[in-house]
Amino acid sequence: MKKWVTAAVCFFAFFLLAGQAEAAGKRKIAIDPGHQGSWVDMSAQEAMAPGSSETKAKATTGTEGRFSGVPEYELNLRIALALKSELISRGYEVVMTREDNDTAISNQERAQLANDSGAEACIRIHANGSDDSSVSGALAMAPSEQNPYVGNLSAESVRLSQCVLDSYCERTGLSNDGVIYADDMTGINFSEIPVTILEMGYMSNE
């Protein structure tokens, strides 16, 4: 877990692979640091997808480092702000869904903010947890082609996810657990641009 504070730079291989680094004037990327502070009550329900009767909490606090005690919402923001700073230094425009742990913003609202911003893609930053402290590795999530809401974004989102994940794992040395389909994530289902959720690793291991 100690590697993650500096892991933001690992995302840049995605931009290089995509041939966008030299054309950064001005490419726009949305970054969503997952979750938020436990004192911000976001337990009210919202639709999981447009028109869906299934609901989920507007936002949650996420997991917590078993050995560090660091909450996921704090780690996600720390990494996201480092990534934002580096991207700006390279000439990119960056849209953040939150820049503190106090902001009350739901997963629907995060997706809509990214949609309305003119960003070309959205990277949602998260971390995993497990009851087994030996479990490690990183993975990424994207919508499947069968997703009834954003199946049209599947191919681009999978490519985005694979590039980000491969680059991240190559630079950090973490095992690559691959891209999985996630059709029950509010932030994915309300997206109108290519989107990925990067699960940076397990906060339950050292």
Question: Which positions does each model-derived feature cover?
Answer:
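Catalytic-site microenvironment of enzymes
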Residues: 1-206
